Amino acid sequence: MAGGKIRKEKPKASNRAPSNHYQGGISFHKSKGQHILKNPLLVDSIVQKAGIKSTDVILEIGPGTGNLTKKLLEAGKEVIAVELDSRMVLELQRRFQGTPFSNRLKVIQGDVLKTELPRFDICVANIPYQISSPLTFKLLFHPTSFRCAVIMYQREFAMRLVAQPGDNLYCRLSVNTQLYARVSHLLKVGKNNFRPPPKVDSSVVRIEPRRPGPQVNKKEWDGFLRVCFIRKNKTLGSIFKQKSVLSMLEKNFKTLQAVLASLQNNGEPALNTTSMDLGDQSMGMEDDDNEMDDDDMEMDEGEGDGGETSEFKEKVMNVLKEGGFEEKRSSKLSQQEFLYLLSLFNKSGIHFT
């Protein structure tokens, strides 16, 4: 109108959600570790690096609203998606209902750590980072073999998985994981690739279980590594002089000797002591980040009131000297060196569970 103000109209916002990111009006909870992949190029890269075959059954853990699920369905034969959040389950079902993918998608609602997993060829997972360790070992100990797992982890956890002897992040988790699998770092993922963005960067790691698996008693191996990594930068000689360590080992030693003596008196055949389980003193294979730095605790070297004897202490030290391990540090030892040292202890009747 003449003499009046011209009002500029604001462009109308589109009601259509971006085609690359399926939102569905769901709010995501950071407290539950819900961070949905929103970068389609990253989704494509993960699928490509997984090496999926058209005949593969794919286990997807934490599918969210299905951005990655769609690409997995396009690449493989079937997707079995395990999702805890009932809202996400409904969103997945709604998204693929009436599409060519609907009969190739099976959704299981539940906690993946408590769910009996079916047979699968490949696992692809974008998980809450708080379940990283227990989920990793659940997969590694899965009763049926699978080709690989491609998993999104918090970056520091991922770098601990792939760390090598001498690396700052080399730890019990590194040795444990690499005993059971070949592990490789695939991608570094910035926090802005997620909705909502997490506080830390992430990494995608490929895990390929070793077949056949290692011939080692899991509890014995884990108990042994827990001792070795009490303080990974101290010498093994210092670690194995600790009263608490000597007391535990001597208790196991005496228990084993009593069992063997009882069997001998009853005329029963000798046991394979390298595979014996003398009681569950370990806490499982999960990484609990209990390794200590040099200033975290004082050493409790020498004899104490725990029942350990100077003779047994000498026996333990002789094992370390025999293998040339007394002055070595866990932070520098390879997997094969750990296996060799454990075999020397077992050969001397010394056990860690």
Swiss-Prot record:
**UniProt note on tissues of expression:** Expressed in rapidly dividing tissues, including root meristems and lateral root primordia, developing cotyledons and leaves, petals, anther, pollen grains and silique abscission zone.
Q: Which GO terms describe its molecular function?
A: RNA binding; rRNA (adenine-N6,N6-)-dimethyltransferase activity
At which positions is S-adenosyl-L-methionine bound? 35, 37, 62, 83, 111, 126
RNA-binding as UniProt keyword: yes
Tell me which Pfam families the record gives. RrnaAD (PF00398)
EC numbers on record: 2.1.1.-
Q: What class of enzyme is it?
A: transferase
InterPro entries from the xrefs? Answer: KsgA/Erm, rRNA_Ade_Mease_Trfase_CS, rRNA_Ade_methylase_Trfase_N, rRNA_adenine_dimethylase, SAM-dependent_MTases_sf
Sequence ranges of Acidic residues compositional bias: 285-308
- Which residues belong to the signal peptide in this entry? none
Q: What name does the UniProt record give this protein?
A: Ribosomal RNA small subunit methyltransferase
Its source organism is: Arabidopsis thaliana
Query: Corresponding gene?
Result: DIM1A
